[in-house]
Design a protein with these regions (language model features):
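Glycine-rich nucleotide-phosphate-binding loops and adjacent flexible coil segments
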Residues: 1-60, 65-97, 102-113, 186
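C-terminal regions of RecA-like/P-loop NTPase motor modules
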Residues: 12, 22-23, 36-55, 90, ...
Length: 200
């Protein structure tokens, strides 16, 4: 990201950037950056996109930026419930990103830094209505470099499935490649370059 901002890219990186921009330009993706979008505006726009363009998934980045005004209770719970009902009505997944509260920062130890359902802002609403809740946890971010068994956690990430209405909960261990903003199987040491990427 910093290299793009500063314009300090190698020739192959410029080629890669050009390739990705063209790919994004041609992608069937719609970005709506309306500030303080209400859940009712979201539902109206989602219905139109599904009907006119066959949209298959909606991602909200992020829940706390939505405007809860105009709701019967003006509450986040009603907002999350409306999003959940919209997903069922449109028969598509809606992924809503959410902030964590500061509780995780004040807890100590390896397990203390793992996010929990209660760490979600407006956790009651999300816990009640979400079909699935997942967290991304990178121990290295908290300067935790090994687990209680001595396993190396440098560059590792966990996907914590904290709630799954129709399945099991659990953790998935992945390798996080920050330089590529990519997650991969922990056993995969070789990165297959994307088109336009330099090998290695």
């Amino acid at each position: 990201g910093e290299k793009i901002k500063s314009g300090q890219l190698a020739p192959y990186e410029w080629g890669q950037l050009d390739y990705k921009i063209k790919e994004l330009y041609d992608a069937p993706m719609y970005v709506d950056d309306t500030p303080s979008l209400s859940v009712f505006e979201l539902r109206t726009k989602a219905r139109r996109l599904v009907r006119e363009h066959g949209v298959k998934i909606i991602i909200i980045d992020y829940l706390q930026l939505m405007n809860a005004s105009g709701m019967s209770f003006g509450s986040r719970q009603e907002e999350v419930s409306t999003i959940s009902r919209s997903a069922k009505e449109l028969n598509i997944p809606i992924i809503a990103l959410s902030q964590l509260n500061r509780g995780v920062e004040s807890r100590e130890g390896i397990d203390g830094k793992r996010p929990q359902l209660s760490d979600l802002r407006e956790s009651g609403a999300i816990e009640q209505d979400a079909d699935m809740v997942c967290f991304i946890h990178r121990p290295e971010y908290y300067k935790i470099y090994s687990d209680e068994k001595g396993n190396d956690l440098h560059g590792m990430a966990e996907i914590i499935i904290a709630k799954h209405r129709n399945g099991a909960v659990g953790d998935v261990l992945l390798r996080f490649r920050g330089e590529f903003a990519r997650f991969q199987n922990p056993d995969d040491d070789v990165i297959v370059p994307m088109p336009g990427e330099a090998p290695g």
